[in-house]
């Protein structure tokens, strides 16, 4: 009622000014909507928090190439490794919220990093989920000469020999480390963690008998297993990996066990919803392309099309799990 009388008084006092103000307001809304609908009208930068040539970089480039072809603008990869991914994430959060700076991110940056470091941002408030584009699990591998031939035998041996089983990783807080820590925590095993500088180096440590077991990215370990250089005894995914169908899942030994990792696209919070939706829908179409499915399959990755709402559900669910895991693995940030 009050707003209606106020509007009538304004129009009566200066109808031309009131009409111009209304036209200007409608024009701004229309331009914003049209801009989002037309996106992209210029090149789009995809920030990747890893160095060139790694698994995340390769996956991001495969998708960027197809985004370019589908949307008619160049999607350019910008590698910004360092500081555990925070440098890249902060740069995207600071960028204009216009959809022209996106971030290709691993799930661990969302769910484990906040428990390890005192961050300048909150990924749950400062990032906008777009799409999870791929998921994968870890492959448990031991030396080919090891007497261990199954996950049950590994658990029993580690339990009978506390402190004598160690596992390698690419570094603290990475997927390799978390996979080993998750098994040790769940089964109450005393297993040592030995970090190396990279995934290949941590795999080589098992192949050369310097470390007992490795929880490896499928890209590295599947090729080694097929080449007879390492013995794969289990996978952490809920279903067997089609690339190595004879290797059982960890859940076949530990019912309900599922440790799956993912990577996908996010934008800075405040990016227009129409842009988020168009990007998500396009990524979903790309995920179903036969060539994309095969290329990711060859990397040991399942091509997925997980949309923003489900994306948010997943990270919220993982949040408490990784908080507990970070505490048990001694990864919690200083308080």
Predicted regions mapped to residue ranges:
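N-terminal secretory signal peptides that target proteins for export/translocation
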Residues: 1-12
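Hinge/capping helix and adjacent helix->loop/strand transition within the periplasmic-binding protein
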Residues: 94-100, 115-201, 250, 255, ...
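Signal peptide processing junction and immediate N-terminal pro/mature segment
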Residues: 29-37
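A ligand-binding cleft/hinge motif common to bilobed small-molecule-binding domains
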Residues: 108-118, 182-186, 213-246
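Bacterial N-terminal signal peptides
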Residues: 17-30
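N-terminal (or domain-start) structured segment
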Residues: 36-126, 163-164, 172, 188-213, ...
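An extracytoplasmic/periplasmic, membrane-proximal ligand-sensing/linker region
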Residues: 41-43, 185-189, 226, 273-335
